[in-house]
A protein has these predicted regions:
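Substrate-binding/active-site clefts of carbohydrate-active enzymes
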Residues: 118, 138-153, 160-341, 605
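Intrinsically disordered, polybasic Lys/Arg-rich low-complexity tracts
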Residues: 636-737
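Conserved alpha/beta catalytic core and glycan-binding cleft of carbohydrate-active enzymes
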Residues: 308-310, 325-490, 498, 519-590, ...
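N-terminal cationic-hydrophobic initiation segments that often serve targeting/anchoring roles
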Residues: 186, 232, 304, 353-357, ...
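Short, flexible loop/turn elements at secondary-structure junctions
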Residues: 51-53, 77, 88, 160-165, ...
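Carbohydrate-interacting/catalytic domains
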Residues: 1-153, 176-186, 454-457, 466-476, ...
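Short glycine-biased active-site loop of nucleotidyltransferases that positions the nucleotide triphosphate
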Residues: 74, 205-209, 253-260, 377-378, ...
């Protein structure tokens, strides 16, 4: 096989090359790489590559026994872009570029723009035609274009494609098999989106995909590019959005990859004090170079447009923004203004977001940015970076630290629960409980919780309830929804056998119920980024580790959220109520169905006329130990109707509390006793005596919880040291495939 002998008309003004060198070719993949083409009636493949320092380049592969120089490329522009048409080559043929460096060395490189690649440990590129896939997600795409990106529900299930579930022999599912397994689960659980750890081609399994060598190729570990298209298409058909991790911050030093592509720095910053992350062993892109900007922005748009991905979570943004990131004194140089900001990276991120969201305002651009860099989610025109979402790493760190604290000492750390509200509305935040928090000795989420076996589950249920109600979109890493005890290991599937144990199935049921509640109640997502959607009621009850607040939607509907972060039953807890009327408990983490003690309010709770917390009325409730409760706040019309009925003779009744196990049981009144007034708030002393009877308002005596006959409704014991989960007296069921 010989290359076509034709004179390639070199012209520096050729539009794709011109735009590429200007940093404005945002579809560079259409020109560079390997493309099936017919010339002079002969089908074949045209190859194009950018290599500004190369002396010579040839295409090598099985078709020429990998012989260097047998199929030499020619410069298109007389400068840095090389091209060759080879007749007879076809789809799936393997190839590389053999580059002769200025030092006289031969280096074999995979195609930076390849659409497909060999499966590791092999690393050659493959000719592949991405055109012709029949998409069926028109309805999804149309709905997304009309959706309110910022003020809509977003509840993300973060997952690693290869280790969510595996087949016999510890083999991962391919894209098609995974879709068949994943879609019913995500649909059942009620997540709105899945977020995939990087699926761009990468050589090292242990990098989880964060050391990318193929920025235009879905990893071949699980199938072909069109298999991945089908995976996305099927999720969209099921109403599930797809977000993927995208890694523009750095790339690995593998010899076949981008590193020293033509023997010298091309994609990486040539300055050694800017071009390498020594701690990670990776190279940093030269964000100020136009050709690199074209490469990266083309990659971002490629996934959004060619694979219909709904959004990108941009990895390691903080490492891009700061020249001194993970560098000691003397290992970095200040910018031209004497500062530590990477001005070129800042300009690149603004350009990236302007380009992507300018074309696709309904897509998500999510920054993993772990510092206090200002205005990450504000428009570039206003001095921001232009993302539309940012991970709230501060909230995550504070809350996990708080939840790991023994409840005996949480009173002194109460600020970790409330501090996030000093900045909660400064950015469009996502609350991330991600893969990074359940690896490297950090322990799984449930193993971060203090106490013995059952206490861990109660803590986690309380945390999940608080997280779902806190302003911001949601993200949870796979396995945490059912209480995976082991840390995540990319080489093993999740411990699905745990669903043979009651506590794990109950926790999964709780997560499912929370997800459904979130999706069905706009108060939890419609006004996430303004004080108009949130109001404190009890922010400062640190001694009892209790908080209470309101979430509101634009129609005026409100949800009252009360969290008890202490394993103490609190009877007669009184707090302010925004509207007079009856408050219906709509979710309780202590419900027996979720593995709790069953101390729930089956009947609505009436307000009484005692002003508290800035409101004209209040309610008195029972707080189960270690629990989160949601109450539906009456609308003013509902409250007025209830008040009118209450004025009628014989209609005034006191709210009573039962458990779901005994809905018909009535509270027995003791004759001759006059009810005492409710205290302003339970005291520390009261908290230590859960056996005391609650005092109640004359207008609405507090309900006394009725214990279920099969469970003891008692206060949690003091937390003990962590220990492995105990078997609950029966064999686990087999994991459902």
């Amino acid at each position: 096989m010989k290359p076509t002998e034709e004179k390639i008309q070199g012209n520096a003004s050729d539009l794709p090359v011109y735009l590429f060198k200007q940093g404005n070719n945002c579809e560079a993949y259409r020109y560079f790489g390997a493309h099936l083409e017919t010339r002079a009636g002969e089908p074949g493949v045209v190859f194009r590559v950018w290599a500004p320092h190369a002396v010579a380049i040839s295409v090598v592969g099985d078709f020429n026994s990998w012989k260097p120089g047998s199929h030499p490329m020619h410069k298109v522009d007389g400068d840095s872009v090389w091209e060759l048409f080879i007749p007879g080559m076809k789809e799936f043929d393997v190839y590389k570029y053999c580059v002769t460096t200025r030092a006289g060395d031969l280096v074999y490189k995979a195609d930076p723009y390849a659409f497909h690649a060999e499966t590791r440990p092999s690393n050659g590129s493959k000719v592949y035609d991405i055109s012709g896939f029949a998409w069926h997600d028109e309805a999804w795409q149309a709905a997304q274009k009309k959706a309110d990106v910022i003020n809509g529900p977003m509840n993300i299930y973060e997952m690693h494609v290869g280790s969510w579930k595996m087949k016999e022999g510890n083999k991962p599912y391919n894209y098609a098999e995974l879709a068949d397994q994943l879609i019913p689960y995500i649909t059942e659980m009620g997540y709105t989106h899945v977020e995939l750890l990087p699926v761009m081609e990468y050589p090292f399994d242990g990098s989880w995909g964060y050391q990318v060598t193929g920025y235009f190729a879905p990893t071949s570990r699980y199938g072909t590019p069109k298999d991945f298209m089908s995976f996305v298409d099927k999720l969209h058909a099921a109403g599930i959005g797809v977000i993927m991790d995208w890694v523009p911050a750095h790339f690995p030093k593998d010899e076949f990859g981008l590193y020293n592509f033509d023997g010298e720095p091309c994609y990486e910053d040539p300055n050694p004090k800017r071009g390498e992350h020594k701690e990670w062993g990776t190279m940093v892109f030269d964000f100020g170079r136009n050709e690199v900007q074209s490469f990266l922005i083309s990659s971002a748009l490629y996934w959004l447009e060619q694979y219909h991905i709904d959004g990108l979570r941009v990895d390691a943004v903080a490492s891009m923004l700061y020249l001194d990131y993970n560098r000691k004194q003397g290992e970095w140089e200040p910018n031209k203004d004497g500062g530590k900001e990477n001005l070129e990276a800042v300009a690149f991120l603004r350009k990236l977001n302007n380009t992507v969201l300018g074309r696709h305002p309904h897509k998500y651009m999510i920054a993993e940015e772990s510092t206090a860099w200002p205005m990450v989610t504000k428009p570039a025109s206003d001095g921001g970076l232009g993302f539309n979402f940012k991970w709230n790493m501060g909230w995550m760190n504070d809350m996990l630290s708080y939840m790991k604290t023994d409840p005996l000492f949480r009173a002194g750390n109460h600020n970790k629960v409330t501090f996030s509200f000093f900045y909660a509305f400064s950015e469009n935040f996502v609350l991330p409980i991600s893969h990074d928090e359940v690896v490297h000795g950090k322990g799984s989420l449930i193993n971060k919780m203090p106490g013995e076996y059952e206490a861990k589950f109660a803590n986690l249920r309380t945390f999940f309830g608080y997280m779902m109600a806190h302003p911001g979109k949601k993200l949870l890493f796979m396995g945490q929804e059912f209480g995976q005890f082991a840390e995540w290991n990319e080489a093993k599937q999740l411990d699905w056998m745990l669903l043979g144990y009651d506590k794990h199935t109950e926790l999964k049921n709780y997560a499912k119920t929370l997800n459904a509640f979130y999706k069905d109640h706009p108060a939890f997502w419609q006004v996430d980024y303004s004080w108009e959607g949130f109001q404190w009621i009890v922010p400062d009850d640190s001694q009892q580790s209790v908080i209470a607040f309101l979430r509101k939607d634009t129609a005026g509907k409100q949800i009252l959220v009360v969290c008890n972060f202490n394993p103490v039953l609190r009877e007669g807890y009184t707090l302010g109520a925004p509207v007079a009327g009856t408050y219906k408990e709509v979710l309780n983490s202590d419900d027996a169905a979720f593995g709790g003690s069953g101390a729930v309010h089956n009947k609505p709770v009436r307000t009484h006329k005692k002003p508290m917390h800035g409101f004209e009325q209040s309610i008195t409730i029972t707080l189960p130990p270690m629990s989160t409760l949601y109450f539906e706040v009456p609308t003013k019309r509902t409250a007025k109707t209830a008040a009118d009925k209450a004025k009628k003779p014989g209609k005034k009744t006191a709210a009573k509390k039962t458990t779901k196990a005994a809905p018909a049981e009535k509270a027995v009144k003791k004759p001759g006793r006059k009810p005492k007034a409710a205290p302003e708030a339970p005291t520390e002393k009261d908290a230590k005596k859960p056996g005391r009877k609650p005092k109640a308002e004359a207008e609405a005596p507090a309900e006394k919880p009725v214990k279920k006959p099969t469970r003891k409704a008692k206060a949690e014991p003091e937390p003990a040291a962590e220990e492995a989960p105990k078997k609950r007296g029966r064999k686990p069921k087999a994991a459902k495939e």
